C-alpha cells in the first residue's frame, strides 16, 4: 500500500465515483433517487456546495472514494464512501476516512456525521474506531 495516494476531486474520476458506490448500494440496498443524482452529478451535489470528493488511487487505478458534503457552516456529512471489493480490509477505507476528517477540520468543522446501516458491519466498525459515536437508531435500521 506504499503506492496508495489519496487525492482530491478530479473530473477524470467521476465514472469511478459512480461505479464504486453503485456496487455497494445495489448489493445491499435499493438505489434511491438522491443517491443516483449525487453519483451522476458529483460536481453539483458535492463540489459546488462546498464539499470535496477524495479518491484512493493505487498504481493509477481508483480503488476507493469518499465524499465530504458541507451541510451547513461547520457541519459536514461523510457520504458515498466505497472501496473496491477485492481490496477491502487493507486500510484503504481508513486512509480515506482520515483524509476526510482532516479536510473537515481544516475548514473549521464542529460536527462531522454520517448515516450508515448496521448491516454494513465492517464500515460501522471503522467509523467507531475513528471516533464516530452511534447517536440514534432509526426505524429504517440506519444509524447516524
Question: At which residue positions do the language-model features occur?
Answer:
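Active-site acidic-Proline motif in GNAT/NAT acetyltransferases
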Residues: 84-86, 90, 118-119
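Conserved GNAT acetyl-CoA-binding A-motif
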Residues: 104-116
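Conserved catalytic-core motifs of GNAT/GCN5-like acyltransferases
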Residues: 113-118, 124-144
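Residues forming the Rossmann-fold NAD(P)(H) cofactor-binding site
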Residues: 94
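Acetyl-CoA-dependent GNAT
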Residues: 4, 8-79, 84-86, 97-99, ...
Amino acid at each position: 500500500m506504499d503506492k496508495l495516494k489519496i487525492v482530491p476531486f478530479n473530473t477524470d474520476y467521476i465514472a469511478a465515483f459512480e461505479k464504486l458506490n453503485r456496487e455497494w448500494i445495489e448489493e445491499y440496498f435499493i438505489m434511491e433517487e438522491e443517491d443516483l443524482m449525487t453519483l451522476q452529478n458529483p460536481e453539483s451535489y458535492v463540489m459546488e456546495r462546498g464539499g470535496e470528493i477524495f479518491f484512493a488511487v493505487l498504481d493509477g487505478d481508483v480503488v476507493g472514494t469518499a465524499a465530504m458534503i458541507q451541510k451547513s457552516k461547520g457541519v459536514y456529512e461523510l457520504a458515498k464512501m466505497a472501496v473496491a471489493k477485492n481490496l477491502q480490509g487493507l486500510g484503504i477505507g481508513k486512509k480515506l476516512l482520515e483524509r476526510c476528517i482532516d479536510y473537515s477540520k481544516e475548514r473549521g468543522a464542529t460536527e462531522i456525521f454520517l448515516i450508515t446501516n448496521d448491516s454494513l458491519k465492517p464500515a460501522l466498525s471503522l467509523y467507531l474506531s475513528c471516533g464516530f459515536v452511534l447517536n440514534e437508531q432509526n426505524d429504517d435500521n440506519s444509524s447516524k
